Amino acid sequence: MMADPRSSDPTAARDNGGDSDACPVRAVVFDFDGLIIASESNAVRTWQDLYARFGLTLSLEKWSTLIGTWDAPWAPAAELRESVGNGHDWDAIEAERRALEIAMSQTLPALPGVIERLDDAARLGLGVGVASSSGREWVAGHLTRLGLLDRFAAIVTRDDVTRTKPDPELYTRALAELGVAPEHAVAIEDSLHGVVAAKAAGMRCIAVPNPLLAHADYSSADVRVDS
């Protein structure tokens, strides 16, 4: 079961060992995949099915290293090509897989609590942003489909930066667009890569562990919310 990543009040996040009263929260920045929509399961399912088509197995443990980043040390497409070899139209095969993932994701709702936390942020006058290692077309497309695009003053994706999470660039760019210093901002993240990025940017961070990473060490986050 997916945890409600927005069940904690963003203003309640404390810097480890710090005092939030001295640094009031003025902005909240959401991750996207796994936080606003539960898209990770479709991605891993389509890749696992493709691996199985060629008699191979893609473990959840290995897949989990990709969650939250576009700069992982391995890529499923490259690994599959290397393992299976030539004689296949890999571009067409991968395009077919991607099209299936996109189609499966078109009916995904906003995760429980998203609308409520956005309403809370509006009521409190907080700046709201998205910082995602996914592409802009993917993120903005789903936000538009959900009727949420105009709820975000800053939308920063991998298309806007040179490095994705765990590098802090996505978050520093989002904060610059919001005009808020990192000590006055909270990130909400489901991945370890995302938590590392948020903390490196100088933000407080609420971690809602992705189900694939539920047993990982999220101690660097300021708050952890489990299902």
Q: Whereabouts are the PLM-identified features?
A:
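Asp-based, Mg2+/Mn2+-dependent phosphohydrolase catalytic module
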Residues: 2-26, 119-122, 135-227
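N-terminal helical cap/lid subdomain that shapes the substrate entry/recognition surface
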Residues: 21-124, 137
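Short glycine-rich loop/turn motifs that provide flexible caps or phosphate-binding loops at active sites
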Residues: 33, 67, 128, 193, ...
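Conserved SAM-binding loop
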Residues: 36, 110, 128, 163, ...
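Residue-level detector of anion-binding/catalytic polar loops
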Residues: 57, 127, 204
